[in-house]
Amino acid sequence: MTLLCGVDPGSRTNAVATLDMSGKRPCLLSWCTLTREELATFVSGMSGFLAIEMVEGVAFDSVRAADLIQTQRAAGGAECVAHVNGVRYECLSGRDWRGEWLRFPTASDKAIRVAIEVTVDFDADLPRIYHDDRKHIYDAIGVAIAGLVVVELILAFAAWRMPSNEEFVAAHPVATQGSA
């Protein structure tokens, strides 16, 4: 089972979605909303890959500066805990993950919802996602999938750039000769 977790941080609660990526389609295994402290505990004990949506200051009005600061504390805290505990993670802004996954950085919440409902299987035993949480849970799902796409692209590029054994031996004959 390949576990993938996405976090949509908020000023009061953080949306978290866990997906299984081992099938043909991603499957939502669980979702929840956590406080900043609960999120830190969750991240410290997780295995798999974590994708965190980072805050874009231009997306907030100056009236909500306190909310912006609290949201950034949650995102930065999750990143710090992941780093300290050796959890593989990727941080993406809302525009980055929407652009990476949907090829449209300013995709609407409705477009995100439609893309997720078409792409992701939902475990039948999951509780219903109510309207108040839906946008944030769907953002957590979206950032998780986009985070994995970014990492896969980086790994594919690295593999493409890595020389084959024959090319390496031809380029470095002294380093690859056995001792006599």
Which role does the model predict for each range below?
Residues M1-A180:
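Phosphate- and other anionic-substrate recognition elements at nucleic-acid/protein interfaces
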